[in-house]
Amino acid sequence: MAKTLAQGRKPGSGRKPGKGKTLREGRKPGSGRRRRQDTGGKETDGSQQDQESRLISSRDMEAVDALRELTHSPSSHSAHNSSAAPPPHAAAASTSLPPSLDYTHQSFMDQQQQQQQQQQQQLLQQQRVDVVPPKPFITHKILLSSTGNSGGHVNSNYNADHSINHNSNHNLNSNVNVNMNFTINGSNQDPSSSFLMGPYNYLQRPFIVKPYLDLSTSTAASNQPRTQPSPAAHITKNSDSTEKNATI
């Protein structure tokens, strides 16, 4: 409770109507004074209570009797029976709804659309022919012909002792078939050139080979006439292995 003047309130320090803070001044939203929507106030509430507590008058009773005579008279019964409404299911059957409101019609149309779509998909699947090329674009023969050896096989064999074995077959065709089994390590490779077993790449870039060669099978091949030098002839000259390189 606020203090009164007798209790020690200062004069002029009371609440001043219409001097509340605005939202900009720091008033919280919803903290303002709430006004009633109805302007009547207590007077309207009192009038409603008077209408509810008022007794039924004679005029009200006369109006009720007149309504009873109109609704329950025998003439109205006969007229009502003659023009009796049809049963609800018959009325519903007679009055047809438009297609936009008839749910059975919509469901039937949806089923028809689904069936048509399924038929179209089946026709498309029957008409579609999967075109598969008979052969791949790059065949084994093309790869062999690009390396310059017709019917030759170049196999790289990685052995544990890192030795290089040159085994020659004695099949004399238009080209000499040579099976080269070799391994290339970091010690055998020229650091200035990157050795790649691609088409014509190993013919253009020579590589350094260790002096140790297995000549057990290549001695018989030295007596055979050769029409074309093998790709392994591109070996740099060493003082210790010149004679061995001549037999390859």
UniProtKB/Swiss-Prot annotation:
GO MF term set: minor groove of adenine-thymine-rich DNA binding
GO cellular component, one term: nucleus
Organism encoding this protein: Saccharomyces cerevisiae (strain ATCC 204508 / S288c)
Protein name stated in the entry: Oligo(A)/oligo(T)-binding protein
Low complexity composition bias: residue spans: 72-100, 111-127
Misc note: Present with 4700 molecules/cell in log phase SD medium.
Repeat (Sequence) residue spans along the chain: 8-12, 14-18, 26-30
Region (3 X 5 AA repeats of G-R-K-P-G): 8-30
Keywords attached to this entry: DNA-binding, Repeat
Phylogenetic classification of the source organism: Eukaryota, Fungi, Dikarya, Ascomycota, Saccharomycotina
